[in-house]
Amino acid sequence: MSSNLPINKQIEKYIDEHSLKLHPVQDEIIKYNDTLGKKKKLQISINQCHFLYLVTKLFKPKEILEIGTFTGLSSLSMCIGLENNSKITTIDKNKDTSLVAKNFFEKAKVSEKIDIIIDEAINGINKLISQKKLFDLIFIDADKENYKKYYELSFNLLKRDGFIIIDNVLWHGEVVDKNNKEHLTEIIRDFNT
């Protein structure tokens, strides 16, 4: 009988060293995010960059919605795997980080594939619903307090064979610790049920 391999820092480093190399602009985004202090935690991991790339490469979605842009690492990771006629729409309320993301998209020469909506996510989602937009893939990685709302509303935007990816559902492993009563941990735990 086999058992699951625990992924520690050594294993993670080994995987990173033997995986697909990041696009130079992905590396730049990561270096930029390193200067942001605690906000860096909003960034997806390198493994997630590879995962999002792989998902878009394998499933070839034509239309992607991302809820939560930050500085654009996840958008760029998905965009690199897309075919030429595919598009990403990404929503974020933060004008400053959205501008940073836009600049990185231009640098990577993918800005024509990515539309940024600067608005509260609920407003942006509702506008897309009113426009009857439909997406093959929806990636949710925004404020955790509204995950349930984003998830429920996303079904109004999802194509029949589409799928939803939700980041942070394990919340760095915190959700399994029943003694952890931190606010965001409880929200994620509730979302998962």
What are these regions (language model features)?
Residues 1-165, 169-193:
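A short alpha-helical cap/connector motif
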